[in-house]
């Protein structure tokens, strides 16, 4: 039996040192907690990695999803094609905006939308394709972009689970109209616990996103967008009354304001991104090197061809014929202080909050997402794991599956 670790190994975990602490203290000592230089620099850095010219930092990845989808300004009842294996807010954002999700099954070993099943689901009201880079793997975005161009659809890349990906040598965001990401603790880096970002190339869309990020007020594009630096304190209401533009509300907005403290923390984390990703990949490779000897018991995760990425977690499927029960496996791992998780929602239409939503689905259902929902689990690969931690997980898996 493997030696017990000195601590529980959670499915996610951030790491920091004095550099993050000092960056946050510098903002506190300045006495100015408003959106400032740190947010601006962070937006520039992350949008570049996403393959975009412009970025808008927000308070979470879920806020980024709601803002990003909303930027398309679709009509109620319009449709967005998406994966049925996903995270809850990918779909709740679609529904909350009065839109209809059109679901496509996944490839079970990649956990990504089956791009070969997208075209058959396009209908007269379909306006966009939006799907996640689930668990850090990615679908073939070249195929998605080609389908979108053929049918006049917009493309949104949900890259909450991974940052810094390339497909066939180029940033994946080069294929999207909008890309977005998250800085939750479980993700590639964090802004002291949370944060998100919407990225785009269109300056007009950027201004719209800024406006909606903070209450819908007109001043946002003058403070942070294409009109920055213009002397425009006063402006006319529709009836001609001159008014302070900080209190002119041109749109229906939210309060998704990011934190200057979080951005300062995130900039330090961003400088460590390659190190973090390398640590994640090391854990993934160690687990894979072991489980490749047990393919009679498990279906291994498969990275999309010609993709450079870093898996957020190591997900695998227990073969139904193997005799391994998932709950028993998870209890075995957790009894040994290795925490595990499901692969996100599974088939989201089987989740209580989503079973009754308006949607469209293929006639043959979602057999692959159902397989993931019943037999898949994922284990930690996060950059907070040390080499001894990873070795302990390998030993525990070896004990579980017999050497």
Map each language-model feature to its residues.
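PLP-dependent aminotransferase class I/II
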Residues: 39-44, 52-55, 116, 128-132, ...
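PLP-dependent aminotransferase-like
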Residues: 70-159, 166
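Buried hydrophobic packing segments
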Residues: 64-69, 90, 94, 196, ...
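Conserved active-site segment immediately N-terminal to the catalytic lysine
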Residues: 157-192, 207, 247-248
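Structural detector of well-ordered beta-strand residues that form the stable sheet scaffold
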Residues: 56, 81, 102, 155-156, ...
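Conserved PLP-binding active-site segment in aminotransferase class I/II-type PLP enzymes
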Residues: 1-71, 75, 149, 246, ...
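Hydrophobic/aromatic ligand-binding patch that stacks against planar heteroaromatic rings
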Residues: 92-94, 147, 171, 188, ...
């Amino acid at each position: 039996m493997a030696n017990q670790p000195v601590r529980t190994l959670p499915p996610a975990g951030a790491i920091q040192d004095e550099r993050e602490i000092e960056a946050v203290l510098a903002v506190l000592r300045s006495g100015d907690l408003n959106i400032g230089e740190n947010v601006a620099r962070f937006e520039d850095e992350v949008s570049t990695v996403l393959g975009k010219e412009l970025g808008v930092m927000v308070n979470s990845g879920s806020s980024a999803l709601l803002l990003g989808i909303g930027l398309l300004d679709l009509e109620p009842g319009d449709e967005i094609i998406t994966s049925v294996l996903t995270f809850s807010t990918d779909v709740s954002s679609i529904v909350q905006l009065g839109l209809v999700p059109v679901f496509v099954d996944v490839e079970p070993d990649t956990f990504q939308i089956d791009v070969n099943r997208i075209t058959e689901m396009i209908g007269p009201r379909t306006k966009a394709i939006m799907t996640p880079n689930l668990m850090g793997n990615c679908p073939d975005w070249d195929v998605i972009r080609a389908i979108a161009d053929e049918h006049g659809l917009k493309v949104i890349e949900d890259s909450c689970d991974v940052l810094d990906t390339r497909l066939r040598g180029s940033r994946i965001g080069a294929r999207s109209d909008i890309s977005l990401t998250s800085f939750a603790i479980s993700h590639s880096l964090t802004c002291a616990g949370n944060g998100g970002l919407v990225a785009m190339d269109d300056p007009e869309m950027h201004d719209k996103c800024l406006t909606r990020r903070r209450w819908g007020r007109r001043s946002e594009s003058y403070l942070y967008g294409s009109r920055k630096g213009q002397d425009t304190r006063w402006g006319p209401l529709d009836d001609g009354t001159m008014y302070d533009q900080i209190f002119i509300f041109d749109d229906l907005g939210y309060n998704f304001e990011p934190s200057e403290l979080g951005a300062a923390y995130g900039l330090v984390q961003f400088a460590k991104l390659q190190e973090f990703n390398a640590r994640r990949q090391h854990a993934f490779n160690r687990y894979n090197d072991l489980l490749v000897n047990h393919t009679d018991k498990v279906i291994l995760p498969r990275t999309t061809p010609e993709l450079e990425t870093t898996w957020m977690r190591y997900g695998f499927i227990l073969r139904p014929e193997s005799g391994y029960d998932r709950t028993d496996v998870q209890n075995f791992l957790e009894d040994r202080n290795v925490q595990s998780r499901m692969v996100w929602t599974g088939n989201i239409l089987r989740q209580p909050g989503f079973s009754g939503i308006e949607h469209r689905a293929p006639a043959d259902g979602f057999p692959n997402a159902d397989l993931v929902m019943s037999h898949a689990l994922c284990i930690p690969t996060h950059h907070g794991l040390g080499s001894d931690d990873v070795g302990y997980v390998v030993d525990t898996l070896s004990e579980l599956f017999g050497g």
